[in-house]
Amino acid sequence: MMHNVRLDQIHDKVVECQENADAATMEFNLEGEWRTSDDDKQFGGLLSFPQGELELNADFPPFLGGEGRAPSALAYCFYGAMSCYGSTFATQAAMAGVALDEMKINLKLNVDFRGALGLGSFPPLKDFQFNVQVKSSASDEEVQKIKQLTDERCPAIWAMQNPVPFTTIATKLD
């Protein structure tokens, strides 16, 4: 183990995936519900993970019709991107044998809500700025190599660089 990354588990998965590519696939199936009661946060659902589940709630800020009683859906999305990048950075460092004594990450961006407010067609997102700060005995060159590997291997970065197909379905219930 290196800085809370279990390298033996990664090694075992790599070996498994070399024999069975499907072993690298992890399916996600999330569910949530819009709450119509004025006394409740607007949206909620359970998020399952290997050792349990967590209830997540979202509420729009007041200017989008909520009360700001919970993080917005976008805040979760951005936290997910930041967490994915940071986790990938720590994992790539461990896989390369680069020890991290400490790592902090910041994500900064602006969101233009004019489109969501019906004021025209505007790109809502422009520039994700990830800033990773590491304390390590590694050289700056090694840290930059880990950054490069992270940029190449982080699923969140990949999703921002490549259009991901999607489908939407709306069904009226009786």
Model regions and ranges:
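Alpha-helical metal-binding/catalytic segments enriched in His/Glu/Asp
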Residues: A81-Y85
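Aromatic- and glycine-enriched beta-alpha-beta binding-site module
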Residues: G86, A90
